[in-house]
Amino acid sequence: MRKHIQHRDFLLDIYIEDTDFQGFVYHANYLKFFERARSNFLLENGIFHKDLVQNSLAFVVKRAEMDFLLPAKLEDSLVIKTAIEKKSKARMIFYQSMVNPEDGKILCRGVIEVCLINLVTKKPQIFPNDLLLIFNKGELNE
C-alpha cells in the first residue's frame, strides 16, 4: 500500500468522444483524464493556474509513467484517485489511479512528476511561499 500526503477523488464519465472504434478509451486520453484530476485537486485547494501564469509560473509534467491494466469503456462511470506521493521545494510526484467504483478494480495507474517553472526563464522555480505553506502544513482539503 502506498503512503500519500494528501489525496482527492475525481468523478469521470466516459463519452463516445473518449473512445476508439471498439468502445474502449483511447490510450492518450488517460493522460488527459489524469491532468483533469490533478487540476481539480489543485483548484479545490485554492491553487489556480491563472494566478500562477500571472506571476510567470506554471506547472509542467517532467515525467509520466502509465500502466494500463484494464480497458475503460464507453459509458463507464469511474473515479480517478489523485494523491501527492512526494514533494520537495520545486516538484511534486503524484500517484494516480483510475478505479471502477462498482468492483474496486484499478483500470490504469500512473506516477506523474510535476515541476514548477518560470515562464520567462523556462527554468525550474522553487514553489512560492504561499504554495509551500499549503503543501507543507497539510492544508490541502481532503
Predicted feature descriptions by range:
Residues 2-61, 117-142:
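Hot-dog-fold acyl-thioester-processing enzymes
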Residues 34, 96, 110:
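Conserved GNAT-family N-acetyltransferase fold
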Residues 102-104, 120:
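Solvent-exposed strand-loop boundary residues in beta-sheet-rich modules
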